[in-house]
């Protein structure tokens, strides 16, 4: 019987050593060199070459080195991870496993979608290809191929992990590992991938395809060989027990410039395949109950529950052009640095109809504004997440019925959309003349059966039903009901989001009352603000050859609402641009109006002429302060408004709500927070308040200016401003 060969002791096989007498022992690896100094090291290190077991090492100890001192040196080297026990075999492959602190991976793999060359590569890596396997390798031409749904279902049934890869194409895709019952499934990944391929999704739906649009194969033998060997490497590491966060990611390798990128893949808790598809419905059924929430900041960026740095840290993982909810965050460099404007991908609030018509509109992308770059970056991120959360997914709570059959349980959409009967009658001409933001739908049919979603009334403390298509972008519904972004808001907490949504509907109502009635409003004294940022901003605008002023357009609701206006001087075109802001703190309202103006300005400075938005084209081409005198401040002293904000967001929410209710209005909040996003998102709805798009039904638009003393009698329909707000 052969005696077992004892393990040898030596430096890890990926480490080299060099003794410099009188200086140090140097340990070298791919990562660099480390100098070791201490008693007996220069004498002991040559013996640790991996050819001796402990007995041989003890026999060959140099004279003068006691065994206990030698043992102490070896212990310290072992604790540092430099030496260890191992078999006597030493080669490049075993050195690799020492370098990654593991043992050689061996196991059985099943392969789907591969050619014979793949099997050869796997066998060369020491793997056994068999149907009864520990791991499946699934190779495909496209990660959205429809057959992968069946592959995913089968692996979830058996519990076998699988690795997805696309070894073809100029850009190779590898990963993630799917482990049934733990982490995301293929459907979680597919939802994100389709979300970042909207044009292809449109083609797929238009042509009735089961999966992605077929593409011609792209391959190069050296690249394919590299890709297959990377697949084999990841499989070997997995079977060796190697685990690291990147295995949950999609890794791409671009052969054109040899760059690699990692795109995180996370489970969607509401996934119909691996999660709980009732999560969104359950949230909608619950009451919306704001709680006390002290503010963390009360600076010019707004009164918020969380600092922007924390928000960015918590939600940055959602940014990726492949697996993210947000495609990108990029600074808009077309204007001065003080503008601090960021962009964050396509604006889904346009819906498919609007996106097709407004590819170059001012609002065709999500954006963020702020006094500082971090505020603007977080604003862009949150706006994109807000838009995504407001997009129809199909798992929303819905009741199918007609308005007439629901009775008092439902809110009529006309109280929210506020189109005039003459707009319905003239809709064909109006829709041809104006952009999608001004689109006039068909008259609502009270007997038509459609989907309704419950929305919580803060005023009544109960749910009432609104048309689902009024609440979610691209939700199926009749052409009489259209969703828009008015009142959609995100925040660090629910209370934060509710307050921002309330302030937005108040702001847009105030702007509409001023704009469409064309009343002159008092100016805000910018010099008296004492804000050094505003003083610097005025200088920047002057350097651009532009005038800057701000109007107070506050309505009967008493929440400070401001309109910032800028025009170019010294030329035939004034290229007038605007920005709006509202807040209980008038200083914050002022900064918000100015930062929104800053957000709009880069496009104008870049020569934008309105793109394919006819309202913007007419405005930038024709509008001047001479033709639109309501843009100029009214004579008289500026109005000074008190700061009514408090240190707690709940108190602010309740104050704005009371002011709305005192005006005879009801406040609704729909919680649109998505489980896979986490950022609180709401839609605030106040029937009767005006959006700032051209919707001219009777109501506040005509009555409030008279009550405020701006007009002696209400304007008629034909007297309203023919220029539409295009922001």
Role assignments for model-derived ranges:
Residues 63, 76, 259-727:
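Helix-biased "structured C-terminal domain" signature
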Residues 248-254:
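Polybasic (Lys/Arg-rich)
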Residues 74, 119, 148-156, 538, ...:
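Short amphipathic alpha-helical segments and helix-helix/interface helices
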Residues 230-238, 382:
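Short glycine/serine- and small hydrophobic-enriched flexible loop segments
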Residues 23, 29-129, 164, 171-180, ...:
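Long, charge-rich, low-complexity alpha-helical segments
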Residues 121, 133-227, 237-242, 254-286:
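E1/E1-like adenylate-forming module used to activate ubiquitin-like modifiers
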Residues 1-32:
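Long, low-complexity, charged/polar intrinsically disordered regions in eukaryotic proteins
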Residues 129, 162-163, 548, 667:
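Hydrophobic beta-strand scaffold residues
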